[in-house]
């Protein structure tokens, strides 16, 4: 009988055991990818998986983390949780080769996902827009973003914003994302549908006269279709991707409110009678309705004395600014929910009453417009749905930038971009973790940065020959920004001196640490004023590092319990006693 031999057992490859750091990194990578995927899919883009698929374009081989497309708009995504600038430069070089070999790229993604993306399509190769987005877990510095202007940087706050927007208004969030990408209506879809200028025409119901508004602001009432507003409207949300440039004042869209309005629209079969308040774009014109096919334009000042007037508004993406009524407009959003079929029947037929504000561009620059609008927004909203303290402070900062509150708000936002408070302040409801700011601004910063040479303020000790010009009504904006930066740098050096003594507990995730609480920060700001009084000058990091070595306070949960939420005077007195002697 032949002897049987047992085949040798295959060696089972042991699964690599990940360290805690590796597990944490993997978890963060998965979270970033899931958020990006969720945004694009919720807003109506198709996804093509390219991760792990190497492809050479020109002379450069490389990989892409993902490709998303809508019609002729293709977004190439790079996902990273690191901050390797050389890695970014390599990726940008690779993207440039993709653009140079566009048709080859389109054929490649068609081969990867033929069921989603067939090529050739109804669009010519030239009609496709290829846009490179760098999605990072951490903020990219200004130097880097300026070095690569062709890249759209999808930082953590911007991604959170668009994800929130997409979850609230689904496909209608695309319009704002297109603006972020630098695209307009004419760039999207078939070129034949975008060669001629489009307009929104409507009969003027009431040309408002005697409104009491300042000269150069004109008011007119008319109707618009919900679809037209969805296509052309934008909102100056404080927490949006554009908020870094300032002058934005509105709240985030509220998903629960949108859902309630959407249910009402679907069940009631009627529109709202409350007016949507908007700003109208440049290029808006007025003509008299009649037999003349080419009627002459009417000056807006003459509207109140003329009947049968038509308003003509350019049909442009993100051109009509909503001051009040964003939820009533976006309740009509495009989306794949169970109400979409009913809403879609009325979106292009249902008219909304609109009150439009038209500015004289010779008298109103953009910052002046936002100041007027933010005041109007507060007037219309604060009584019916109380504005939160942080947004209220922010709006006051816009309205009165040279007030102590206005300066304090701008200083705090500047400090949030610097160590030791970089990205630690809670400036947006999109942030779940952070240091709350209203108390810090009101009780800590406001008095310290005031434009006063009589009080113990940073302004008093600011060495600048031109500083008194800030007290004039016609002040120099660059001088104002110089003072904001001086305050932020000086206070950052002060708190960096403090951090050098408490670096082990300078961490928001440390549940036993109380050094990054509003109470502690207000106390240290009040003590900074005491240091100004004693030393009669603004000191630097090394000075404060040396002084804080004397501090014996332990900012632990138990030790800090004696200093309640508003007991900063006691804490400030102890800091004064131990440090400024």
Regions found by a protein language model. Name each.
Residues 3-13, 58-61, 71-75, 80-581:
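Accessory terminal alpha-helical modules
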Residues 1-60, 69-70, 107-113:
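Acidic-basic catalytic patches of nuclease active cores, encompassing PD-(D/E)XK
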């Amino acid at each position: 009988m032949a002897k049987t031999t047992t085949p040798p057992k295959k060696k089972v490859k042991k699964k690599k055991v990940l360290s805690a750091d590796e597990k944490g990194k993997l978890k963060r990578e998965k979270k970033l990818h899931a958020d990006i995927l969720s945004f694009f899919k919720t807003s109506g883009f198709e996804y093509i998986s390219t991760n792990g698929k190497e492809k050479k374009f020109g002379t450069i081989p490389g990989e892409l983390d993902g490709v998303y497309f809508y019609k002729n708009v293709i977004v190439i995504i790079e996902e990273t949780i690191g901050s390797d600038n050389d890695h970014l430069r390599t990726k940008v070089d690779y993207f440039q080769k993709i653009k140079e070999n566009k048709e080859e790229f389109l054929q490649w993604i068609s081969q990867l996902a033929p069921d989603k993306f067939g090529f050739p399509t109804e669009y010519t190769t030239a009609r496709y827009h290829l846009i490179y987005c760098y999605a990072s877990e951490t903020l990219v510095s200004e130097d880097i973003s300026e070095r690569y202007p062709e890249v759209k940087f999808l930082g953590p706050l911007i991604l959170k914003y668009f994800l929130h927007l997409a979850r609230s208004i689904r496909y209608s969030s695309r319009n704002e994302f297109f603006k972020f990408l630098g695209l307009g209506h004419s760039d999207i879809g078939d070129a034949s549908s975008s060669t001629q200028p489009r307009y929104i025409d409507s009969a003027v119901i009431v040309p408002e006269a005697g409104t009491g508004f300042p000269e150069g602001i004109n008011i007119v009432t008319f109707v618009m279709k919900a679809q037209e507003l969805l296509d052309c409207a934008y909102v100056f949300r404080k927490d949006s991707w554009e908020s870094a440039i300032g002058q934005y004042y509105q709240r985030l869209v509220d998903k629960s409110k949108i859902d309630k309005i959407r249910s009402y629209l679907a069940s009631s079969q009627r529109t709202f009678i409350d007016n949507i308040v908007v700003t109208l774009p440049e290029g808006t014109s007025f003509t008299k309705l009649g037999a003349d096919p080419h009627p002459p334009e009417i000056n807006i000042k003459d509207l109140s004395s003329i009947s049968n007037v038509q308003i003509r508004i350019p049909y442009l993406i993100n051109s009509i600014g909503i001051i009040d009524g964003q939820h009533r407009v976006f309740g009509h959003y495009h989306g794949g929910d169970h109400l979409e079929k009913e809403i879609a029947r009325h979106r292009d037929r249902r008219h909304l009453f609109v009150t439009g504000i038209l500015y004289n561009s010779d008298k109103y620059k953009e910052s002046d417009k936002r100041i007027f609008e933010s005041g109007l927004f507060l007037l219309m909203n604060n009584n019916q749905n109380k504005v939160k303290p942080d947004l209220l402070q922010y709006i006051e900062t816009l309205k009165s930038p040279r007030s102590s509150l206005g300066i304090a708000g701008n200083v705090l936002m500047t400090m949030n971009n610097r160590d030791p408070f970089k990205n630690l302040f809670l400036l947006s409801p999109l942030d779940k973790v952070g240091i709350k700011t209203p108390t810090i601004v009101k009780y800590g910063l406001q008095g310290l940065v005031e434009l006063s040479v009589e009080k113990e303020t940073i302004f008093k000790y600011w060495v600048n020959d031109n500083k008194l010009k800030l007290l004039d009504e016609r002040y120099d904006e660059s001088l104002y920004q110089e003072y904001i930066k001086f305050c932020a740098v000086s206070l950052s050096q002060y708190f960096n001196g403090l951090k050098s003594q408490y670096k082990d507990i300078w961490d928001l995730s440390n549940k036993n640490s109380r050094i990054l609480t509003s109470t502690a920060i207000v106390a240290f700001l009040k003590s900074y004023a005491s240091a100004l009084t004693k030393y009669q000058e603004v000191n630097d990091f090394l000075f404060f590092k040396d002084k804080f070595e004397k501090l014996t306070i332990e900012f632990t949960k138990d030790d800090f319990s004696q200093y309640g939420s508003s007991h900063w005077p006691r804490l400030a007195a102890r800091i004064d006693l131990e440090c400024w002697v």
